[in-house]
């Protein structure tokens, strides 16, 4: 008995140890000669307090390649890249292909640049995603800015409420900043665009990279695996000296980057006959009445809450969607909001169909729920009889009319008496 209790106690301690040691491993790459790490201590300490295990690496301290993998296992969950002028060192330590592989394998990346520090490794990596930061030496200017010494941007230029939803008017200090042009991709998440009166100019040259609100100061990207990237065009944005104006936005931005918020999941996706009979009990056939329902929850950084939306759609597809129906709320509990299609009729076509909910909203994590089921055709004894088809009534009436007429003719022919007539005979004489 004592042995059993000891075994149970060891298992309990091991479980507590595993839960307690689940930290988010983060690699911090910086250039001490360009941007001293002490200037970002407020946000780095905040990450450590939120159970992030930070590993720091000065790119000038080594020229060897940084190991992001142990065989096929990721060694880090996140990477933070501060502005660096040692572009060649960064390229040797983390090549572009390695960054792409890390991002494809669900690793999150936060990178910053400045007009004087735009490493080619980061630039080429961002270009692969459709984000084009301004070249080195290009600075965004706004002569209508409240400050003549640094760029100040209003919260009115925020573009995505799932990243940061300002409850009141705020001003964000960027100092000297770069701006980026964006491709038209659904994975790109525009977060903060430049003021309409701004433009990007090169020092000593008259050419411009962006003009007005076509430039972006903060940009996100979320791949299909829900790994996230954020690029910030200014090295001053996260500095301690600007935390009074930028703190709330910066904290929420870091939470979004590292999947601490705006993460949704789909649960309890079910479909059945309209009377509640499941597919296993009675497989679907064409023109059956069916109901589909699914639930959605959203992680707010502390707990799962019901996700409220009015644009979630259900698709019944074979190759292309046969139906695309907007889901309606049907109920909720403390964690989940449930949605349903209501009753709908399956198409008059048999085959293999996918019951699909693919919800992709910019700023929220992507979630897909699909179930593949076969829809059979009607059996021989399940087709409607001819008299049930209204279009056949004309032909049935014609057939019945012919039969009745024939019977009437036969009866009349048989029962009607014939009149006898005597024939005269003559003998032929020569």
Swiss-Prot record:
Subcellular locations according to the entry: Endoplasmic reticulum membrane
Residues exposed to the Lumenal side: 24-393
GO annotation terms (biological process): protein N-linked glycosylation; protein N-linked glycosylation via asparagine
Topology versus the membrane: Single-pass type I membrane protein
Signal sequence, renumbered to the chain: 1-20
Intervals, Cytoplasmic compartment: 415-430
Residues of this chain annotated as glycosylated in UniProt: 60, 332
The protein's annotated pathway: Protein modification; protein glycosylation
GO molecular function: glycosyltransferase activity
InterPro entries xrefs: DDOST_48_kDa_subunit, OST48_MD, OST48_N
Pfam families: OST48_MD, OST48_N
Annotated TM spans: 394-414
Keywords assigned by UniProt, alphabetized: Endoplasmic reticulum, Glycoprotein, Membrane, Signal, Transmembrane, Transmembrane helix
One cellular component (GO) term of this entry: endoplasmic reticulum
Sequence similarity: Belongs to the DDOST 48 kDa subunit family.
Miscellaneous comment in the UniProt entry for this protein: Present with 14900 molecules/cell in log phase SD medium.
PANTHER family to which the protein is assigned, alphabetical: DOLICHYL-DIPHOSPHOOLIGOSACCHARIDE--PROTEIN GLYCOSYLTRANSFERASE 48 KDA SUBUNIT (PTHR10830:SF0)
Function statement: Subunit of the oligosaccharyl transferase (OST) complex that catalyzes the initial transfer of a defined glycan (Glc(3)Man(9)GlcNAc(2) in eukaryotes) from the lipid carrier dolichol-pyrophosphate to an asparagine residue within an Asn-X-Ser/Thr consensus motif in nascent polypeptide chains, the first step in protein N-glycosylation. N-glycosylation occurs cotranslationally and the complex associates with the Sec61 complex at the channel-forming translocon complex that mediates protein translocation across the endoplasmic reticulum (ER). All subunits are required for a maximal enzyme activity.
Subunit structure: Component of the oligosaccharyltransferase (OST) complex, which appears to exist in two assemblies comprising OST1, OST2, OST4, OST5, STT3, SWP1, WPB1, and either OST3 or OST6. OST assembly occurs through the formation of 3 subcomplexes. Subcomplex 1 contains OST1 and OST5, subcomplex 2 contains STT3, OST3, and OST4, and subcomplex 3 contains OST2, WBP1, and SWP1. Interacts with SEC61, SBH1 and SSS1.
Domain notes: The cytoplasmic C-terminal domain contains a functional dilysine-retrieval motif, which is involved in the retrograde Golgi-to-ER transport of the protein.
Name by which UniProt lists this protein: Dolichyl-diphosphooligosaccharide--protein glycosyltransferase subunit WBP1
Organism whose genome encodes this protein: Saccharomyces cerevisiae (strain ATCC 204508 / S288c) (Baker's yeast)
Protein encoded by which gene: WBP1
């Amino acid at each position: 008995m004592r042995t059993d209790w000891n075994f149970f106690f060891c298992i309990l301690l091991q479980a507590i140890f595993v839960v307690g040691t689940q930290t988010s491993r983060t690699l911090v790459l910086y250039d001490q000669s360009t941007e001293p790490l002490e200037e970002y201590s407020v946000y780095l300490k905040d990450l450590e307090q939120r159970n992030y295990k930070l590993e720091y690496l000065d790119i000038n301290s080594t020229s060897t390649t940084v190991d992001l993998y142990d065989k096929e296992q990721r060694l880090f969950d996140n990477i933070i890249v501060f502005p660096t002028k040692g572009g060649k060192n960064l390229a040797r330590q983390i090549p572009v292909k390695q960054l792409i592989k890390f991002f494809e394998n669900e690793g999150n990346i936060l990178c910053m640049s400045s007009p004087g520090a735009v490493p080619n490794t980061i630039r080429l990596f961002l270009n692969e995603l459709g984000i084009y930061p301004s070249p080195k030496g290009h600075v965004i200017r706004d002569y209508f800015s409240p400050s003549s010494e640094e760029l100040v941007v209003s919260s009115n230029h925020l573009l995505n409420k799932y990243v940061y939803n300002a409850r009141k008017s705020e001003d964000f200090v960027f100092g000297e900043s770069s701006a980026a042009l964006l491709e038209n991709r659904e994975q790109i998440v525009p977060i903060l665009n430049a003021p309409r009166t701004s433009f990007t100019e090169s020092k000593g040259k008259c050419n411009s990279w962006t003009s007005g609100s076509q430039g972006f100061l903060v940009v996100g990207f979320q791949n299909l695996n829900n790994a996230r990237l954020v690029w910030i065009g200014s090295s001053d944005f996260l500095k301690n000296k600007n935390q009074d104006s930028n703190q709330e936005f910066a904290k929420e931005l870091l939470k979004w980057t590292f999947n601490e918020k705006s993460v949704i999941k789909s649960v309890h996706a079910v479909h059945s006959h309209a009377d509640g009979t499941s597919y296993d009990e009675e497989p679907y056939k064409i023109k059956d009445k069916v109901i589909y329902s699914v639930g959605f929850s959203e992680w707010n950084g502390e707990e799962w809450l019901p996700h409220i939306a009015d644009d979630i759609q259900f698709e019944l597809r074979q190759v292309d969607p046969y139906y695309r129906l907007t889901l309606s709320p049907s109920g909720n509990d403390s964690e989940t909001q449930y949605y349903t299609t209501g009753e709908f009729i399956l198409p008059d076509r048999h085959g293999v169909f996918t019951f699909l909910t693919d919800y992709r909203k910019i700023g929220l994590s992507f979630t897909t729920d699909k179930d593949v089921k076969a829809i059979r055709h009607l059996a021989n004894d399940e087709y409607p009889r001819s008299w049930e088809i209204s279009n056949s009534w004309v032909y049935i009436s014609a057939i019945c009319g012919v039969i009745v007429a024939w019977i009437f003719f036969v009866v009349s022919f048989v029962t009607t008496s014939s009149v006898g007539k005597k024939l005269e005979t003559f003998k032929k004489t020569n």
